[in-house]
Each structure stands twice: as C-alpha cells, then as structure tokens.
C-alpha cells in the first residue's frame, strides 16, 4: 500500500477508536493495538513529512460535551510518551524529577478568582474545551472556594474508581449497554447535560489535581506547588521525588502496586516532571507536546501465546457473552486461563476458531485484566449457541445501538 494512503487509513481508524474510547461508547480496539498503530503512524509521518491536520499525533484527545466551547487560557498540551525507562533517565538528566501516576480519566482545568471557583473546562483538543462549570456540585474534589485571593488555574484528572465502576455496571441489566472501563464511564458521564446532574453525582467522579498551572506569586518548586494545592483543599495525584539514578527502582516499585491490584483508581502509566518548575516552562512545543512539561511512561505489554481449549458462554441478565478458556499461561506474575471475548463481532475480528488448536496471543490490559489481542493460528470456526446454557431458551443475535 502507498505510504500516504496507509497514513490516511491509520488516521481514520485511530480517530474512530479514539472517539469511541473518549465518548462513552464501546471500545473497538485495545490500548495495546491503539499504541501500536499510533507508533506506526508516527514513524510514517516522520518518514514522509505527510501529516494530516486531523491526525491523532496533532490532537490531544476527543470528547463530546453539552457545555459551551471555550478557549483555554493556557493550552492543555499532551505529553510525549515512551515505554523505555532509559528514555526517562535521559530526559531527567542531572535534575531531580517527580514521578506520579498517569490517571486514566478525563482531564479538567479549574479556575479561581478572588477565592471563588469561576470555571471548569474539559481539555478538549488542548486548545479549546467545553465549559462544564454547571457540574461544580456534582464532581467531587473540586473546592467551591479556596483561601487564595489571586488568579489560580489547576489541571487534574476526573476519574471513577474500579469499585464505583463495578457497582454502576452491576445496575445495568443489558450487557451490551455496560461500560467498557472506568475511563469510558467517566467520559460518558461528563458528557451529560444539566438535566442529569443527579446521575453525575451518583457516579462519584473525583477530581485529582496533577498540575498547578498558574499562581500569581512565584513558586518554582513543583513539590511545593503540589503541597500548596493540598493546603487549598485539593486531592493531589500521588507523587515521589527521585532522579535519573533512582528512576528504575521507583518505576518498578510503583508498577508492582498495579500488578498486585493495589490501585482502585484506574491508571494507564506514569509521568515524570521536573522539580524546577521554572525550567520546565522554558521548553519548546513540538507537534502537540511541550518538550519540558513532562514525560509519560506506558508499560510494555508482555504477551504470551497459549492454546484455546473452548469458548464458554457466560450468562448475565438477558445476554450471553463469549469467554475464551485456554491453557493456563504465566503472565505478569500470575497464571491466567480465561479472558472475555466481549461479543460475536470481536470474535469475528480476532478470527476465533474452536477445534482445540487455535493459538491465542494474550496480554494483561493495564497489567490487570487478561485480554486476547490476536490469533496467531486459527483452526476451525466458532459456534454460536442455539440455546441459553442456563435457562435453555432459544437465543437470538442482537445488534447494539452503539
């Protein structure tokens, strides 16, 4: 395929996946697949110099909201990312850096004047966001007033815990209507209108501050800025001071917390930023990234091959859903033998076959949830049950509206 056509195809596919991911719809690809396609697009753009304006490499994100569109006072740019600790060490150089979680929610920017909350904007495309100030009483963790009389701008992540996510999904009877993950639910919730504020409040979306964007007074220490936010009443993202020499140990230790299931707040990586906030502001802007604002680290997805034994059809409410049951395989410190296949469309996309010889490629998404990302070798075809395995009623295929 011509490289320019390949770029156009990748942009279209990635944008469709991003729109589904950010706007409360069903996921159409895994983070693992998205990252791989994004990296391929980046390489092709660098090689050819052919960059479409709508390319995801040029945009911070996708979202829909019922709020009025409004320009950001300070652009909310995305961060460059890597999967190599060595890149973080080079970026840190000889300077102390702070490591924190990369929370998997929706970025918001909150503004205060004379001690009062005056604005809540979503990140949008990084330049223009949606004004959702009308949700100020429904989002937890955003103080209505602060003990500061100047102009204050704070950036943070609005997220839903796994505990609340599971409780909310349990109230949805139709499996096809359930949310794919907490990020998906948070984004869909913040896209609701003023008539649904009670529903927003019931979902316990919490704001976690990760950057003090503007303060009238000079405060050059990133750590002091975070301490100040805590004094003002914000919940800040967890953070730890380190340097290039200590980064590997800190990253490994924090990663273990995710692998051991200690995190109730969804995360999809780590972030480092300079302790010297003044130095961080001196970087250039390349593409849609501020070169010294921070550096994101995403975990390498460790995959393992295994053989599919059979597909089990799991019943919940009025829906039966496919689950891959495969030969046990060691992955990320645990042994896994089952993974959801979501629905019939996903089985068809993957190319699932059921004759005991189909080879699957399995990962643990975000180091937690087993997920089938591909079929290495397909043997046979799969069979859709004619009758429910529980109540024995005749089955029918339904197409989700989403």
Question: Where do the language-model regions lie?
Answer:
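Phosphate/adenylate-binding "loop-and-lid" substructures adjacent to NTP/NAD/dNTP-binding pockets
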Residues: 1-146, 184, 258, 265-267, ...
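Structural signature for extended repeat/solenoid scaffolds and their inter-repeat hinge/linker regions
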Residues: 364-402
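A short beta-strand motif that forms part of the nucleic acid-binding face
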Residues: 113-114, 122-125, 325-328, 343, ...
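Short nucleic-acid-contacting surface segments enriched for D/E, G, S/T with interspersed K/R
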Residues: 345-360
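Hydrophobic beta-strand signal
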Residues: 273, 358-363
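Long, charge-dense accessory insertions within large macromolecular proteins
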Residues: 86-89, 157, 162-348, 370-371, ...
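Short, conserved beta-turn/loop elements at beta-strand boundaries and strand-helix junctions
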Residues: 115, 313-317, 377-379
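Long, non-coiled-coil amphipathic alpha-helical linker/lever segments
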Residues: 148-159
């Amino acid at each position: 395929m011509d490289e320019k056509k390949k770029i156009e195809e990748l942009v279209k596919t990635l944008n469709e996946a991003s729109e589904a991911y950010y706007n409360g719809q069903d996921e159409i690809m895994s983070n693992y697949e998205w990252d791989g396609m994004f990296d391929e697009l980046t390489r092709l753009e660098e090689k050819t110099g052919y960059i479409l304006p709508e390319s995801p490499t040029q945009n911070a994100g996708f979202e829909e909201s019922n709020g009025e569109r409004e320009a950001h006072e300070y652009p909310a740019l995305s961060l460059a990312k890597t999967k190599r600790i060595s890149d973080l060490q080079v970026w840190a150089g000889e300077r102390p850096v702070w490591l924190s979680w990369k929370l998997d929610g929706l970025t918001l920017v909150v503004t205060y004047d004379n001690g009062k909350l005056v604005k809540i904007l979503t990140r949008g495309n990084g330049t223009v966001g949606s004004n959702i100030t009308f949700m100020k009483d429904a989002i937890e963790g955003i103080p209505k007033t602060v003990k500061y009389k100047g102009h204050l701008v704070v950036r943070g992540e609005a997220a839903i815990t796994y505990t609340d996510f599971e409780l909310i999904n349990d109230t949805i009877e139709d499996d096809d209507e359930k949310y794919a993950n907490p990020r998906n639910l948070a984004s869909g919730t913040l896209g609701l209108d003023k008539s649904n504020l009670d529903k927003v409040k019931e979902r316990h979306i919490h704001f976690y501050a990760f950057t003090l964007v503007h303060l009238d007074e000079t405060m050059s220490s990133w750590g002091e800025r975070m301490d100040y936010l805590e004094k003002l009443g914000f919940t800040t993202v967890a953070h730890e001071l380190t340097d290039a020499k200590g980064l590997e140990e800190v990253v490994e230790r924090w990663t273990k917390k995710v692998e051991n299931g200690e995190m109730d707040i969804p995360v999809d990586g780590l972030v480092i930023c300079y302790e010297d906030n003044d130095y961080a502001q001196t970087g250039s802007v390349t593409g849609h990234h501020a070169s010294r604002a921070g550096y994101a680290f995403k975990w390498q997805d460790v995959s393992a091959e295994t053989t599919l034994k059979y597909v089990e059809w799991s019943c919940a409410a009025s829906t039966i859903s496919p689950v891959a049951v495969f030969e046990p395989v060691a992955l990320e410190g645990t042994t896994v033998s089952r993974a959801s296949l979501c629905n019939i469309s996903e089985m068809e996309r993957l190319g699932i076959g059921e004759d005991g010889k189909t080879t699957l490629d399995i990962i643990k998404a975000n180091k937690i949830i087993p997920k089938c990302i591909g079929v290495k070798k397909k043997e046979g075809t799969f069979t859709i049950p004619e009758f429910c395995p529980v109540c024995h009623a005749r089955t029918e295929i339904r197409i989700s509206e989403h």
